[in-house]
Amino acid sequence: MNNKVHKLSIIGATGRMGQMLVRAAQEKKDFQLVGLLEENGHDLIGTKASELFPSLEKNLVISDSLDKILKISDVVIDFTNPENSVKVAEEAAKYKVVDVIGTTGFSKSQIKKIQNVSKNTTIIRAGNMSLGVNILTGISAKVAEALDSDFDIEIVEMHHNKKVDAPSGTALMLGDSIAKTKGKKLDNLKDIQRDGIIGPRKKGKIGFSVIRGGDIVGNHSVIFAGPGEQIIIKHNATDRMIFARWALKAAKWGMTAEKGEYSMQDVLNLN
């Protein structure tokens, strides 16, 4: 049992997910918040954290120095943007700091950079941190494996109107798990752009549909449509705190893991 109190810093601490992570960390006795990072030029740089989060220590301030924060941290959690998350991963690796990444929308080259620096530290990167979605991922792969090519596969995802990437990292994670059961890469199977007269659906493709609106936290459905029947598996998130709490579980798991890149499937022992 790992009962050590780990020094934790939150990257993008004043953002939507950053604030959730700060609140979730305060629920945990095995983490001590030592750093709250924001980007250079942010209006809140230098602000006492207790002004935003009254229960935090009064000497903790919002910082823009990644270097200073990494020097005092055991682990960082980052839900920001791809470019920033790559930079954080590269710097965290230099300090051997565990890095939990919940950012989505990475390019192939950015993923490669993260994989390369994971040789020097533990990195946990997931398109979705929740238990339910990761179970959905495993179930979807098993269903896909059991069905023949008569079943068309569609993934439908819904998110709030502020989300900037599409399809969501979760939808791509679901598609990737299904593609692997077929011994193929998702890039060769995914069908995203549909507009106009496109002809009949191509056999074996994995279709993606994207919905953006309101304050939807995150809904994902995997549809297996065959002749005369459909199998629909879905997960709805109603509270962002689930992502924060499971990110903290990933952070604790990462403290005893070997160097390398891991997913939530590893953290939850679902592989």
Each language-model region and where it sits:
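Extreme N-terminal starter segment of soluble prokaryotic enzymes
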Residues: 3-8
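C-terminal substrate-binding/catalytic lobe of Rossmann-fold NAD(P)-dependent oxidoreductases
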Residues: 11-70, 149-271
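Aromatic/hydrophobic pocket-lining residues that form π-stacking "cages" and hydrophobic walls in ligand
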Residues: 21, 88, 114, 143, ...
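Short, ordered loop/turn segments at secondary-structure junctions
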Residues: 39, 104-106, 128-129, 158-160
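An anion/phosphate-binding loop that grips the pyrophosphate of nucleotide cofactors and donors
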Residues: 73
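N-terminal Rossmann-like NAD(P) cofactor-binding module of classical short-chain dehydrogenase/reductase
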Residues: 76-77
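Rossmann-fold NAD(P)-binding glycine/threonine-rich loop
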Residues: 86-95, 102-123, 134
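Rossmann-like NAD(P)H-binding beta-loop-alpha module
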Residues: 135-150, 166
